[in-house]
């Protein structure tokens, strides 16, 4: 396996040389550096003591946690023998200390403890009940097969950070797969990315409720080919009930009109869901991320601007795609800034959204938005 050096954040690691990243024997995706930037900032702000990167590959995520955050104990895990060897090599390159090996586990002792494990992620999480303050699930595809053990491996009031890269499934391109994996009906069209993210969160909420765990969304977003959510777990049946009460269903038509309602079952045909209808961010948490990002060695040039966009985004369910509305009204789409300004002049809240460059988030009803589109 030929290796090349790459730098990301404060880490300098070795990764396999390959023409296509998916052909490499150990996976490393530079596009996900923004994801890792935000994750590092989250750990820095939250200050957990024990962190697990359950699916580590090269080890870049866990190594950055060890280098760039106050975490005292960081675990890296992968089932691949090649990944295990590379994780040990990369950890030793970046973190001072002596490496001790015991079977399929190595310990790097220095200012912090870095544990490098070769094994099945589900088994590792099952063996460490309520041990980790921050648990990161960043799989290839769906995280569903890891949710039961992950939820039970996080301490009370700990955080589960979960990624899903099966956007085609959650966005409705593979409806049957979404029904199987997420037990939810997806939606196609301009709302698919927000609905897909909310289906993912709704699935975690339903899994967590089995263990009397409620879910508080600190931050959830869509970017590139993936969905990402930082979820604080709250113990107690009442907390679980409260989270379940935030689930519901979405209806949308080709004109861009949508409606949503909370409830355990849909009350009319054509519904998408169940999905999360609660907030997608904790505003104070996002502000802390932004503040921390301004003086942090970020790996991706767009991390700061992306967080800024999310911080300014109106946190209401779903958005109006102005191009869809324009087609329905036989109009040329007006400039988004003009639409937002006019809605604000009418007394409504309105912002851009990270889900789509042609959409507006607003508390204005469909009729008002359509009328603004016709008259600006």
Swiss-Prot record:
Q: Which reaction equation describes what this protein catalyses?
A: guanosine(26) in tRNA + 2 S-adenosyl-L-methionine = N(2)-dimethylguanosine(26) in tRNA + 2 S-adenosyl-L-homocysteine + 2 H(+)
Residues reported to bind S-adenosyl-L-methionine: 36, 61, 78, 120-121
- Check the record and name the InterPro entries matching this protein: SAM-dependent_MTases_sf (IPR029063), Trm1 (IPR002905), TRM1_arc_bac (IPR022923), tRNA_met_Trm1_C (IPR042296)
From the UniProt record, which GO molecular function terms apply?
tRNA (guanine(26)-N2)-dimethyltransferase activity; tRNA binding
Q: Name one GO biological process term.
A: tRNA N2-guanine methylation
What Enzyme Commission number(s) apply to this enzyme? 2.1.1.216
Q: Which domain of life is it from?
A: Archaea
Keywords in alphabetical order, please.
Methyltransferase, RNA-binding, S-adenosyl-L-methionine, Transferase, tRNA processing, tRNA-binding
Q: Which residues cross the membrane?
A: none
Keyword tRNA processing: yes or no?
yes
**Trm1 methyltransferase domain ranges (all copies):** 4-373
Per the record, the similarity remark reads:
Belongs to the class I-like SAM-binding methyltransferase superfamily. Trm1 family.
Q: In UniProt terms, what function does this protein have? A: Dimethylates a single guanine residue at position 26 of a number of tRNAs using S-adenosyl-L-methionine as donor of the methyl groups.
Looking up NCBIfam families in the UniProt record yields: TRM1
Full protein name? tRNA (guanine(26)-N(2))-dimethyltransferase
The species is Thermococcus kodakarensis (strain ATCC BAA-918 / JCM 12380 / KOD1)
